[in-house]
UniProtKB/Swiss-Prot annotation:
Keywords: Amino-acid biosynthesis, Aminotransferase, Cytoplasm, Pyridoxal phosphate, Pyridoxine biosynthesis, Serine biosynthesis, Transferase
Any one of the GO CC terms: cytoplasm
Similarity annotation: Belongs to the class-V pyridoxal-phosphate-dependent aminotransferase family. SerC subfamily.
Binding residues for pyridoxal 5'-phosphate: G76, R77, W102, T153, D174, Q197, N239, T240
Residues carrying N6-(pyridoxal phosphate)lysine: K198
Record-given protein name: Phosphoserine aminotransferase
EC number: 2.6.1.52
Cellular localization per UniProt: Cytoplasm
Protein source organism: Salmonella paratyphi B (strain ATCC BAA-1250 / SPB7)
Chain's role: Catalyzes the reversible conversion of 3-phosphohydroxypyruvate to phosphoserine and of 3-hydroxy-2-oxo-4-phosphonooxybutanoate to phosphohydroxythreonine.
Length: 362
């Protein structure tokens, strides 16, 4: 079978080594004669899986000891509700930065629980979409927290700055599409959350990193399954967790460690992004509408000069083993998601195809 590279934005490509190991262990995990999917989440065998996964995740991000790691249900959208329900306390407002589709989705959900102060950070620089630098974000005095999305998968927009608003500002962020792709100073945040299906593992699992002094503040109407304190007190097993997704994510963490950790992965991700953007920028046939300072290294949207060729591009690229390149319906065009598991060989195959396609159709 010819090699296939999956450029899906999520559920996304998983490391080949991880899939191979999971396949080998699927029916007989560690000699038990049963699958890891079938063992009790409260048994000693799975508890070991859970503890190792958390420790490896902590090691990869150098998470300080005063932060708790929660393995949750609900995805990023679940945390759009979980953040205000856990952090508002007796306040009625929070600051929300709007820089793209997912930030706006978080704002929409937050309006059910508070009156968000919206910081519109979208700007245009030399005709390209961009984001205001953090120093220009006007924070309100009475906000319970600040929320933003560092990487917009649909828009292909990234905010690479590290927040520095002082110790009084509780910064929360949706790292679903960029976590583990670059070094991250966890101590600058109150809450970090990430759906697993892009850079962590399969869909169904959500990781939350929460500073321990923020526990115990959930609204009385907060569902128990979203209550950080309840989840922490029960070691993320208040109800049956998504055990197979947890196990596979643990394998991904070990794979990341074997690659040299997050710093090494960051260098590879930079190389992949530079390769792809280089082909786009050196062509009149392809274009990307995001300012260079805010270009995502994870999600690269691009348009063809003639959108009548979109269907042909997608058909031919799929036949060449380059899958899931169709852009989101909101923006159209193409999108290549090049998360950690995408090898540089996959990006090289894509750029070679793009150059050849332009030669034949340009």
């Amino acid at each position: 079978m010819a090699q296939v590279f999956n450029f899906s934005s999520g559920p996304a490509m998983l490391p080949a080594e991880v899939l191979k190991l999971a396949q080998q262990e699927l029916r007989d995990w560690h000699g038990l004669g049963t699958s890891v999917m079938e063992i009790s989440h409260r048994g000693k065998e799975f508890i070991q899986v859970a503890e190792e996964a958390e420790q490896d995740f902590r090691d990869l991000l150098n998470i300080p000891s005063n932060y708790k790691v929660l393995f949750c249900h609900g995805g990023g959208r679940g945390q759009f509700a979980g953040v205000p329900l856990n952090l508002l306390g007796d306040k009625t407002t929070a600051d929300y930065v709007d820089a793209g589709y997912w930030a706006a989705s978080a704002i929409k959900e937050a309006k059910k629980y508070c009156a968000p102060q919206i910081i519109d950070a979208k700007i245009t620089v030399d005709g390209k979409r961009a984001v205001k630098p953090m120093r220009e974000w006007q924070l309100s005095d009475n906000a319970a927290y600040l929320h933003y999305c560092p990487n917009e998968t649909i828009d292909g927009i990234a905010i690479d700055e590290t927040p520095d608003f002082g110790p009084e500002v509780v910064v929360t962020a949706d790292f679903s599409s960029t976590i583990l792709s670059a070094p991250l100073d966890v101590s600058r945040y109150g809450v970090i959350y990430a759906g697993a299906q892009k850079n962590i593992g399969p869909a169904g699992l959500t990781l939350v990193i929460v500073r321990e002094d923020l526990l115990g503040k959930a609204h009385e109407s907060c569902p128990s399954i979203l209550d950080y304190t309840v989840l922490n007190d029960n070691d993320s097993m208040f109800n049956t967790p998504p055990t197979f997704a947890w196990y596979l994510s643990g394998l991904v963490f070990k794979w990341l460690k074997a690659q040299g950790g997050v710093a090494a992965m960051h260098k590879i991700n930079q190389q992949k992004a530079e390769l792809l953007y280089g082909v786009i920028d050196n062509s009149d046939f392809y274009r990307n509408d995001v300012a260079q300072a805010n270009r995502s290294r994870m999600n690269v949207p691009f348009q063809l000069a003639d959108n009548a060729l979109d269907k042909v591009f997608l058909e031919e690229s799929f036949a060449a083993g380059l899958h899931a390149l169709k852009g989101h319906r909101v923006v159209g065009g193409m999108r290549a998601s090049i998360y950690n598991a995408m090898p540089i060989e996959g990006v090289k195959a894509l750029t070679d195809f793009m150059i050849d396609f332009e030669r034949r159709h340009g």
